[in-house]
């Protein structure tokens, strides 16, 4: 598949439908609880599948993947922070909050990438699922540390700064007990320890309806992403450019790690690139809102959900797969 055919995947088309419905002011809406239920199902399904595959995988390779997931989660926010400061469009607090989103991961983008790979018949390793489960928290920690550093510099310079909400221990607990992280890790453990026969009995639930539920999830995400269009004027052109270019740079770093450091196949390398390129819009926003009250939520929400998520779904995933094919397919 190439060119326009890369976009002719039901999941991507449903995202476009949701986006269009919002633009033309349709009354199409999802009940909040239904949207949450779709997210829960997808996390459980991908966790069980990943755990089942992990049970057959090599432990050393899994630990290696875990290590590089932490490295990505720690380094990408720092890169994003200094790039944002260089734009001179945001202060240190907003730079820290935005950077935390870009060091974390988007389960929705990851699931869309899986749908894309399945649609073109590309196999992938189970290890990126482990990486997905652990990359949320390191980025949140780095975001908090960058904000604390900025706050300390402001106080040292005699400037007044708002007191960050919540202590570090509380925020770290929030990060590690976040519902999406607990669900994903818990489902992975279940998929790992359950007997193959018992996993087979729930395959209609975790496999057969997966793609259909993903289409509904992305329909709702299209509606939500289009809602952020109105905030673009507040974000500014340079920050919109950051929301497009940062994922591309991070995705290339992900390709280098997926193939060069982990030795993954084209599919696995693509998924590592997607993990590196995605920006969180579920776990990180509440953590930043609580811990970095100085930051403007409309900036990091508009960038992660209104710019980067649509870019990755429509253009980024095919791009990262193309690069992975050129690198890992040699």
Regions found by a protein language model. Name each.
Residues 1-55, 319:
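N-terminal signal-anchor module of multipass membrane proteins
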Residues 1-19, 59-66, 70-221, 236, ...:
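Alpha-helical transmembrane segments of multi-pass small-molecule/ion transporters
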Residues 22-36, 52-58, 195-210, 227-231:
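Membrane-interface junctions of multi-pass transporters
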Residues 35-38, 180, 239:
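Membrane-interfacial loop-to-transmembrane alpha-helix junctions, especially the N-terminal start
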Residues 232-241:
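Membrane-helix boundary/juxtamembrane motif in polytopic membrane proteins
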Residues 47-50, 54-57, 151, 222-225:
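Transmembrane helix-loop junctions and nearby membrane-interface residues
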Residues 25-27, 45, 51, 99, ...:
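Generic secondary-structure boundary/loop-capping signal
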């Amino acid at each position: 598949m190439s060119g326009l055919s890369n976009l002719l995947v039901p999941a991507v088309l449903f995202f476009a439908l949701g986006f269009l419905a919002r633009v033309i002011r349709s009354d199409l809406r999802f009940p909040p609880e239904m949207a949450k239920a779709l997210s829960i199902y997808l996390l459980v399904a991908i966790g069980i599948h990943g755990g089942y595959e992990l049970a057959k995988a090599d432990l050393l390779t899994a630990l290696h993947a875990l290590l590089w997931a932490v490295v990505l989660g720690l380094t990408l926010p720092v890169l994003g922070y200094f790039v944002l400061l260089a734009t001179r469009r945001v202060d240190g607090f907003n730079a820290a909050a935005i950077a935390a989103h870009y060091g974390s991961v988007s389960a929705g983008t990851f699931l869309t990438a899986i749908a894309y790979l399945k649609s073109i018949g590309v196999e992938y390793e189970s290890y990126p699922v482990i990486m997905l489960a652990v990359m949320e928290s390191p980025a949140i920690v780095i975001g908090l540390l960058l904000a604390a550093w900025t706050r300390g510099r402001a106080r040292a310079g005699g400037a007044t700064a708002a007191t960050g909400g919540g202590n570090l221990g509380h925020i770290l607990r929030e990060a590690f007990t976040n519902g999406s992280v607990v669900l994903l890790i818990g489902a992975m453990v279940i998929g790992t320890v359950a007997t193959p026969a018992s996993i087979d009995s729930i395959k209609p639930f975790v496999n057969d309806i997966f793609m259909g539920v993903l289409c509904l999830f992305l329909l709702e995400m299209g509606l939500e992403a289009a809602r952020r269009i109105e905030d673009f004027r507040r974000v500014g052109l340079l920050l919109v450019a950051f929301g497009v270019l940062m994922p591309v740079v991070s995705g290339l770093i992900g390709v280098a790690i997926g193939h060069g450091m982990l030795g993954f196949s084209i599919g696995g390398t693509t998924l590592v690139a997607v993990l590196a390129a995605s920006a969180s819009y579920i776990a990180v926003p509440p953590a930043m809102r609580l811990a970095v009250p100085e930051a403007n939520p409309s900036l990091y929400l508009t960038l992660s959900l209104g710019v980067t998520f649509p870019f990755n779904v429509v253009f980024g995933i095919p791009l990262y797969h193309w690069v992975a094919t050129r690198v890992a397919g040699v």
